[in-house]
């Protein structure tokens, strides 16, 4: 008997960091888990272009597709799609521009590395991105 692999959802996500070293987490309407801003990569679209599009649609931020630093490709259980995995192209975006919740975003939260213990977090955010964020903040410059 073969076991079907979970469906894979390709996304672009932003580790958005402000000048105070906080990162932005978002929660989509009708969901419980906070996660990085970003979204699905459309057919034929680059991860960078998808990130710029999603940041503009969801938060009103204008980011040139070449500006974010690519941090890697990561995979985890999807927070809002049962039986699916997300594969994220993660980019660091440094910005002090004030985001505003738009499209499907219901809540925004600027958090420091140690402020997330009481939040419901997406598996990718909790298990991969926030530990990476903490490492980035503690790395010597």
What label would you give each PLM region?
Residues 16-17, 25, 92-93, 110:
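Conserved hydrophobic "DFG−1" position in protein kinase catalytic cores
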Residues 74-100, 132:
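Active-site-adjacent beta-strand/loop module that shapes the phosphate/pyrophosphate-binding cleft
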Residues 90-92, 100-132:
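NUDIX/MutT-family hydrolases
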